[in-house]
């Protein structure tokens, strides 16, 4: 069986994950299928994604994959759910950390997001996910839910930094932080030689994200 290539990097400075609970052989096999499916989706794209291609990646029979995921849509949705929830869980753990100040929590999350979105495999994954959401109702519903969770997470850390912000203002700031990072991912992916240096773009993006959290007061 081939090893998994696509993995979320650890959140630098953030809390480490607890050891996973004991899994049954069935649970372990399902996770192996999903891990292979994430690789296939990122490398081959939405149009070429299939249970057969995942089975080939795992070097198992098609019926083995179909035993856990009966059709392509179920496999696709669960693949994207696993990837999206991986990010949300890591960032939620960072936000809940008592060892970090609110500002440090945001800085760690933004640093990690900016690092992840400059990875070619991560870019490919999210571009393909956005494309598939235009054609697959199940993927669209999942993406809407994950995006809502992501914006809520950012809104909460904004409120931690500046408690005086009204709920709507914090939601706007969180949404703009997400837009800043995702927009930068697109711009840098398709930018030409005239694009400003990445180091400068990342530095300014971090400052913009922090500035969005501050209104009539200093960040915590």
Regions found by a protein language model. Name each.
Residues 66-69, 115, 128-135:
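Short helix-capping/turn signature of helix-turn-helix
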Residues 78, 92-122, 173-177, 202:
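Hydrophobic alpha-helical connector segments
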Residues 81-87:
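Short, basic, alpha-helical segments at the C-terminal edge of helix-turn-helix-like DNA-binding modules
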Residues 118-127, 137-162, 172, 199-203, ...:
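Amphipathic alpha-helical packing segments from all-alpha helical-bundle domains
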Residues 1-28, 39, 216-220:
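N-terminal intrinsically disordered/low-complexity leader segments
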Residues 29-32, 36, 40-74, 78:
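Helix-turn-helix
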Residues 115-119, 135, 177-196, 208-218:
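Amphipathic C-terminal alpha-helical segment
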